[in-house]
């Protein structure tokens, strides 16, 4: 039977532990243990912090509402600071010492891929919050994810470029795991959309100036547009440099910068006209009244912004969907055992989240298609839908 997202239906009770040690109080009923390792600090904190805040906020709401099948959840969270070795260590600790029945996390592709062999060997269901397609292709029995893949992002961007007849483009990709993976995916499918890559440059995550790479791309014969692929501060630096060089070409970014923080860091003037694929969450108030994602996205946005005083981001939305997917699976499994939760999770049908409507299967551990992405443009420092 199709599952319609409802906060009231999936609320549960929980105690929280955050950071590198448990803060939760013990309880005889705190017997459903869900673990999380997130990059709440370090270079990926702009991703991991809203994820951690979202999980805490939601379990607080869950605490107030009354439980999954009359049992409590204890959420145990560690901060891996974006370090793959720490993520692997924490995943092992969550399973062996904390005895969790499921794990949410892996903020980045690098930390996620360090966690994957641990959960697969232990047989513990894991929902990743990372973007790269390699997380779920090939399909692994216990590994799922909520963000759209980098390959999907390439396809969505190339569809828009094709419509605008921007067929000769340059790439500027980060050398981090996300940037490298998305670069590979874009190179693989460009020809399917009639796109020719006439320039291919890279940047390191800590680079403070990308003028040389952008100048090289600007001077490529016939170039019509530039696509930046990356996470963190790098894409913002590239966007500022782009404006400083007054490059008269449309600029595209990836879903890796789909948050207000990108606009704030790069500046509203520099980001004017930038396009990228994003989730419904960024334009929640602009969605049609009949859009099934509108009530989910607007409710989360209002709750998160009210609780934190910060703008809701796509990344927090990934955590929102992951937690609710896991809670729904536990309810349907009717028992908090890893194998039962995994089977129920894989049988999810019609779950409406901030990223889209999710239908999972033995051959698809993401459950989203390209229509779940929205092409967005920044105008006057705000996100708007591209018609």
Would you name each region that the model predicts?
Residues 89, 133-135, 141-246, 290-291, ...:
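Extracellular/periplasmic Venus flytrap/periplasmic-binding protein
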Residues 94, 98-107, 127-129, 170-173, ...:
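Periplasmic-binding protein-like
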Residues 35-56, 78-85, 107-108, 172-180, ...:
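Extracytoplasmic "Venus flytrap"
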Residues 33, 46-53, 65-137, 146, ...:
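Beta-alpha junction/loop-to-helix N-cap segments that form part of ligand/metal-binding clefts
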């Amino acid at each position: 039977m199709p599952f319609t997202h409802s906060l009231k239906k999936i609320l549960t009770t929980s105690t929280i532990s955050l950071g590198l040690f448990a803060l939760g109080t013990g309880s005889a009923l705190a017997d459903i243990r869900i673990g999380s390792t997130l990059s709440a600090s370090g270079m990926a904190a702009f991703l991991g912090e809203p994820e951690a805040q979202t999980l805490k906020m939601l379990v607080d709401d869950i605490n107030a509402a009354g439980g999954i099948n009359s049992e409590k959840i204890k959420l145990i969270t560690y901060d891996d600071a974006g370090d793959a070795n720490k993520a692997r260590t924490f995943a092992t600790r969550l399973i062996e010492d904390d005895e969790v029945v499921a794990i949410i996390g892996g903020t980045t592709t690098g930390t996620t891929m360090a966690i994957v062999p641990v959960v697969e060997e232990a047989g513990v269901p894991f929902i990743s919050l990372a973007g790269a397609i390699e997380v779920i292709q090939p399909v692994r029995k216990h590994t799922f994810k909520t963000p759209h893949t980098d390959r999907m992002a390439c396809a969505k961007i190339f569809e828009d470029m094709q419509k605008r007849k921007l067929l000769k483009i340059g790439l500027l990709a980060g050398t981090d795991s996300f940037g490298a993976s998305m670069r590979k995916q874009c190179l693989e499918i460009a020809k399917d959309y009639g796109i020719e890559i006439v320039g291919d440059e890279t940047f390191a995550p800590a680079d403070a100036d990308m003028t040389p790479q952008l100048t090289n791309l600007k001077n490529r014969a016939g170039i019509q547009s530039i696509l930046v692929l990356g996470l963190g501060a790098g894409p913002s630096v590239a966007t500022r440099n782009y404006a400083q060089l007054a490059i008269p070409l449309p600029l595209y970014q990836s879903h890796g910068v789909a948050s207000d923080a990108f606009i704030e860091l790069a500046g509203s003037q520099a980001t004017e006209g930038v396009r990228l694929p994003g989730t419904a969450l960024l334009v929640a108030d602009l969605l049609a009244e009949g859009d099934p994602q509108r009530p989910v996205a607007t409710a989360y946005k209002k709750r998160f912004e009210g609780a934190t005083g910060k703008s809701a981001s796509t990344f927090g939305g990934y955590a929102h969907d992951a937690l609710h997917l896991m809670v729904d699976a536990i309810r349907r499994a009717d028992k908090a055992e890893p194998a039962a939760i995994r089977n129920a999770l894989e049988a999810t049908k019609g779950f409406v989240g901030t990223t889209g409507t999710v239908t999972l299967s033995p051959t698809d551990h993401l459950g989203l298609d390209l229509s779940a992405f929205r092409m967005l443009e920044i105008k006057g420092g705000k996100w708007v839908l591209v018609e």
